[in-house]
């Protein structure tokens, strides 16, 4: 009996039976009835619906949260599992008070539907006891809606409307069923403090389906560069992943995180650039993961492995190169000043700079040849300090040489005014723009990470001369000046941010020492201070919820795929480590299982990436039109962990009582979209994309409230073209209904670029307390902006 009550409280357990009302009171009241005779068949737990709070806007947390996460079997006295129920769905509309903001709204001509009584629902617990009857009312949607347009923003201090946000995350087919869970009793509950929650049926209100793409499982049949995992049960060869065999859907999920809502058509050049780079890095990380899965003595890493070359081969073979076969003079469509690239091969893929080694790219211009782009990395004693004037050393003369085994270095010689050098000189006469890419190689022994390249914009070549170089031979020097009117490079702004007296600094550390690095607040717009709230670094569970740590693995050193047969944590992740050894996430999964508090592996384990807190120098800043936002003072490589979204974990009943302060309420639910998986199926030969969630496959059970208690994640704004995405992670318990929500970078993010993710609002589905449709413009400024937040 006690166990039945516990499960009912945590999950809003299954409803025993609901007698359908067809041709009855529902139809008499004019309520629209579902198809198939007005009866909606719901699976156990996965199909249970709950009435949503009437809030301004709704966004969901990752898959596996809410009541869809797992099937909880509740037995009655006869020991049988409760039968699948059939529930009559109708439009639900009830007027609720949303606080002072809505009380002040002047809304007229509102028609509310008459309430319709639906037969009470009865919850059955073990032993045949009935907890109580649950009644539901339904009504017609209100017409004569009023459009309320407000300025965008997520800060309560910005004066905008309150919002509840949807976090869209990745899932695949396996997450929709939520079968084979390891723990059916993940939480302990203090019975004296618990009141039975009141689940309700929801009908009619639909939420947006578009957003950050969620990946379905992919299957690779390409033998040359198959991105699959090894066979876990193979005794002949435990470590080598056999390219002659097909990979199962669970073995391959490339993270080239998908497009945002409204951008799947690919009409935007900017969107095409982002999609291509995400595909490239997804393949890179998968190749690296494949190599890291081998025993150390068999790894190619550090022994000539060029994952960028191998990944580019896959993209080129599948026709994913942009601007292939053409040379572009001037701006490359979709490439913006300040864009960062981890590998030089990315410049080739996008058509920014096609030579893989030469520093000067050129094309035919009439009868002459002019330069189209240069890579200035300081290798030729280039002067890179001035942001507007660049002194570039010509190519040739055997200046830059790398000694290879069995080869002798050539003697330096004078540079000649030919090929690229001649093209740069001709650009002076023709006054043609030259793209400049500044490169700074990372000071690390790991060459597989490549260099760091930043697109600086367009320059004009002003003059050139010849002088003696550092090696004693004549070299050509070219002076280029940046064309005015282009955005300033981020590293110039970073220099200003590191000055002793920083303009606009209004708080040194909003975390008050709770984070490893201070998180400052900067406002260069006005005199507004950051909103007051209690900073916390951990998700706050209610008193009645006590997470039960999962079983530990047997590892005493860092967990690896080589120990998949004995490491329980690796086995939970499909027999592979979901991160590269540098901490970058490899692929989007429904849920990532990290090592828990009972595991004996060290803190440096590859399966503890998100448990070390925030490592990046983040700060909040006042935006021009969207309240407070979040940015980073350094470059963020794609796949990097950013932060967790933390707050107070609430049940729906408690969250409904806090509706007056719903700006930071997050409904935990499911979202699934296979748009990126469709793109990956085109990239990788033989891959298949799974189905998307149906319109009715959504539910909600829990909420995270960061209004009064939260961390820096509460300030992250919306964008129609986001650079972050959310991922389910479990480590301190195994209840997939309430996972930790972690933000990861889905792009290479330059310093001081605002960090954003897609709130996934449903257009024309957000209503105020009077039932009127509300509209709010979007000011994200993305090339694929939907122009409306909801």
Swiss-Prot record:
Residues the record lists as binding S-adenosyl-L-methionine: 626-628, 662, 664, 714, 717-718
Segments of this protein annotated with the region Disordered: 251-271
Residues annotated as domain Post-SET: 774-790
Domain SET: 616-760
Binding site for Zn(2+) 1: 553-555, 559, 567
Boundaries of every YDG domain copy: 330-482
Catalytic activity: N(6)-methyl-L-lysyl(9)-[histone H3] + S-adenosyl-L-methionine = N(6),N(6)-dimethyl-L-lysyl(9)-[histone H3] + S-adenosyl-L-homocysteine + H(+); L-lysyl(9)-[histone H3] + S-adenosyl-L-methionine = N(6)-methyl-L-lysyl(9)-[histone H3] + S-adenosyl-L-homocysteine + H(+)
Residue intervals of the Pre-SET domain: 551-613
GO BP: methylation
GO molecular function terms listed in the Swiss-Prot or TrEMBL record: histone H3K9me2 methyltransferase activity; methyl-CpG binding; methyl-CpNpG binding; methyl-CpNpN binding; methyltransferase activity; zinc ion binding
EC number: 2.1.1.-, 2.1.1.367
Keywords: Centromere, Chromatin regulator, Chromosome, Metal-binding, Methyltransferase, Nucleus, S-adenosyl-L-methionine, Transferase, Zinc
Superkingdom of the organism of origin: Eukaryota
Positions annotated to bind Zn(2+) 2: 553-554, 569, 595, 599
Function: Histone methyltransferase. Methylates 'Lys-9' of histone H3. H3 'Lys-9' methylation represents a specific tag for epigenetic transcriptional repression. Seems to act preferentially on dsMRNA.
Written domain comment of the UniProt record: Although the SET domain contains the active site of enzymatic activity, both pre-SET and post-SET domains are required for methyltransferase activity.
Designated name of the protein: Histone-lysine N-methyltransferase, H3 lysine-9 specific SUVH6
Organism: Arabidopsis thaliana
